[in-house]
Amino acid sequence: MPVRAASWSFTEDDFGAITQSLQRFLHDSNARCALLVDRTGQLVATVGEQPTFDATAFATLTAADFSANDQLARLIGESDFTTLFHQGERESMYLADVARRVILVVLFDNRTTLGLVRLKVKQAVDDLTELFTRVFARPTGEGAPNVLAGSDDEIDKLFQ
């Protein structure tokens, strides 16, 4: 059964390939967790350590962060920023654009370095871009369940 998000959907095989790519990335980078979020703020996949926070709210805020930074890029004459980095005392996150429609979010701590994460993200983004390019090129099937139904109500509840 296809999973639907925005105007595209992917199959169980697609999801398996995406998950395998993320698992390989986590192993190679020693990062804690990788999340895929579409540009509308919908959580597509989570691999690695399960987040201890509300992943749905996090996905929404991640998409908003990436969108805001795209606008900042335009203000300084860039078309966009393809990666973002946020550093904390104990936890950091690295965000990367995948195929202009999905955001790879990497959560990591002092078990790895920013340099290693950046190095391994490049290959992961290339792999995921190839996978998602095929998914986006495929016609969406009729009758695929619309997982966005009711999402406006859920988003409103987050901020009440």
Which role does the model predict for each range below?
Residues 2-33, 40-160:
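Acidic, low-complexity cytosolic segments
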